[in-house]
């Protein structure tokens, strides 16, 4: 049987799909009210805890200015907070191991981004658009036998 509709509004309401609510994300906090996440980059692994505060950053028990002396590394570290407009709103406690300073800074950035999303799930879209939630999978290529390095061959002599 064909239904009869007296107006366009009736037709619209009959054919409209049921609206779905946006998924509701929940904060993931520990007993001290901190969000935790792990970040990785090259060989470095960073464990990051964040809690609301004044913007104090402690890396391996030292101030961030001492541990990451180069300003570029500190800038990499602060990028997620800058994009999310949350500079000086969170205290960070970080333990990082493995790799060099550049890889460690990248690992902290990755972990901080994930911890921010755990604390404020609505920041996920902003941080994902900037690429901070994506693990940078580039690692050092292994050395092959018969070669000097991963790709460089030994010097060749014709005679």
Curated annotation (Swiss-Prot):
<dbReference type="GO" id="GO:0003735">
    <property type="term" value="F:structural constituent of ribosome"/>
</dbReference>
<dbReference type="GO" id="GO:0022627">
    <property type="term" value="C:cytosolic small ribosomal subunit"/>
</dbReference>
<keyword id="KW-0687">Ribonucleoprotein</keyword>
<protein>
    <recommendedName>
        <fullName>Small ribosomal subunit protein uS9</fullName>
    </recommendedName>
</protein>
<dbReference type="Pfam" id="PF00380">
    <property type="entry name" value="Ribosomal_S9"/>
</dbReference>
<dbReference type="InterPro" id="IPR023035">
    <property type="entry name" value="Ribosomal_uS9_bac/plastid"/>
</dbReference>
<dbReference type="InterPro" id="IPR000754">
    <property type="entry name" value="Ribosomal_uS9"/>
</dbReference>
<dbReference type="GO" id="GO:0006412">
    <property type="term" value="P:translation"/>
</dbReference>
<keyword id="KW-0689">Ribosomal protein</keyword>
<dbReference type="InterPro" id="IPR020568">
    <property type="entry name" value="Ribosomal_Su5_D2-typ_SF"/>
</dbReference>
<dbReference type="InterPro" id="IPR014721">
    <property type="entry name" value="Ribsml_uS5_D2-typ_fold_subgr"/>
</dbReference>
<dbReference type="GO" id="GO:0003723">
    <property type="term" value="F:RNA binding"/>
</dbReference>
<comment type="similarity">
    <text>Belongs to the universal ribosomal protein uS9 family.</text>
</comment>
<dbReference type="InterPro" id="IPR020574">
    <property type="entry name" value="Ribosomal_uS9_CS"/>
</dbReference>
């Amino acid at each position: 049987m064909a239904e009869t509709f007296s107006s366009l509004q009736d037709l619209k309401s009959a054919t409209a799909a049921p609206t779905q609510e946006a998924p509701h994300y929940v904060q993931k906090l520990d007993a001290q009210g901190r969000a935790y996440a792990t970040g990785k980059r090259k060989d470095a692994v960073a464990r990051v805890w964040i809690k609301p505060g004044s913007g104090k950053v402690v890396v391996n028990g030292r101030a961030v200015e001492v541990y990451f002396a180069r300003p570029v590394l500190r800038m990499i570290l602060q990028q997620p907070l800058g994009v999310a407009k949350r500079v000086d709103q969170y205290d960070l406690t970080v333990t990082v191991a493995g790799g060099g300073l550049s890889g460690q800074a990248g690992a902290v950035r990755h972990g901080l981004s994930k911890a921010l999303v755990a604390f404020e799930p609505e920041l996920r879209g902003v941080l994902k658009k900037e690429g901070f939630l994506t693990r940078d999978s580039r690692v050092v290529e292994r050395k092959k036998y018969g070669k000097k390095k991963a790709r460089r061959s030994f010097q060749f002599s014709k005679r």
